[in-house]
């Protein structure tokens, strides 16, 4: 019986809607990582050596990531759910909202999108090296992983609260649904930008394994990659479990969940 279920799941992974979902995740992750890494390159190119301690580049990167993630989630929301992040997909898999086989294809699409985005930037960045996410000199790997975990927990919990909806909505007022989706995507993007401002100088505030993986592949620098996988994945898992407890009436009593 288990083997039959696995075969059914695998068959669904190659259906037309599933293939469109993978493409949507590839494109949306490409968009976000291209924006995030590209803004970091541009900020570095426009910063002179005597003002490297200025907050300007960090603010510019935070704003770019906020709007980049907003756009990425919005364009993929009705096709794939707009995960744009392996940690979000992992949380949905833990919550039973996506099958493990499909989640693996989502991860592959996201990692490929991030890698191709960085390859594109490497071609057109006028000799500038693709920057990788790094932890501060005074911070340990464990401390960095914990911080990334906390940030990702908050981000993924936000995703669950404002963006809990099925791809290809089941009828209703299209304009109102789009407005609700856009508002949810904006909330996620603003959360990303706020956390970049809060912790960008400490760990880069990645909160997204694909965001760190793409630059590492292109640059060849994989130092502290474990920080950007272990922390976000654990944080995402905890967020999924906490959200289930908060939103499940059988656990919390008569709680009326507002679902976008």
Swiss-Prot record:
One of its GO terms (cellular component) is vacuolar membrane. One of its GO terms (biological process) is water transport. One of its GO terms (molecular function) is water channel activity. A motif (NPA 2) lies at residues 208-210. PROSITE patterns: MIP. Its main location: membrane. It is a multi-pass membrane protein. Pfam families: MIP. InterPro entries: Aquaporin-like, Aquaporin_transptr, MIP, MIP_CS. It is found in: Vacuole membrane. A motif (NPA 1) lies at residues 85-87. Aquaporins facilitate the transport of water and small neutral solutes across cell membranes. Belongs to the MIP/aquaporin (TC 1.A.8) family. TIP (TC 1.A.8.10) subfamily. This is Aquaporin TIP5-1. The lineage of its organism: Eukaryota, Viridiplantae, Streptophyta, Embryophyta, Tracheophyta. The gene is TIP5-1.
């Amino acid at each position: 019986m288990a083997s039959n279920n696995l075969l059914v799941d695998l068959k669904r992974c190659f259906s037309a809607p599933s293939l469109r979902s993978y493409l949507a995740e590839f494109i949306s992750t490409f968009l976000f990582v291209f924006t995030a890494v590209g803004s970091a390159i541009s900020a570095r190119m426009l910063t002179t050596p005597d003002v490297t301690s200025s907050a300007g580049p960090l603010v510019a990167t935070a704003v770019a990531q906020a709007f980049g993630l907003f756009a990425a989630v919005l364009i993929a929301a009705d096709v794939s759910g707009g995960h744009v992040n392996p940690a979000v997909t992992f949380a949905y898999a833990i919550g039973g909202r996506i099958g493990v086989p499909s989640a693996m294809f989502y991860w592959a699409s996201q990692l490929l999108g991030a890698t191709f985005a960085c390859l594109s930037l490497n071609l057109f960045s006028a000799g500038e090296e693709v920057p990788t996410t790094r932890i501060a000199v005074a911070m340990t790997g464990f401390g960095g992983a914990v911080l990334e975990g906390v940030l990702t927990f908050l981000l993924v919990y936000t995703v669950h609260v404002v963006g809990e909806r099925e791809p290809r909505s089941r009828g209703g007022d299209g304009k109102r649904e789009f407005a609700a989706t856009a508002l949810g995507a904006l909330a996620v993007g603003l959360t990303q930008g706020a956390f970049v401002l809060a912790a960008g100088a400490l760990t880069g505030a990645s909160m997204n394994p694909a965001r760190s993986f793409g630059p590492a592949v292109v640059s060849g620098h994989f130092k502290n990659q474990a920080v950007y996988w272990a922390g976000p994945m654990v944080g995402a898992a905890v967020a999924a479990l906490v959200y289930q407890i908060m939103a499940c009436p059988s656990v919390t009593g008569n709680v009326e969940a507002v679902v976008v």
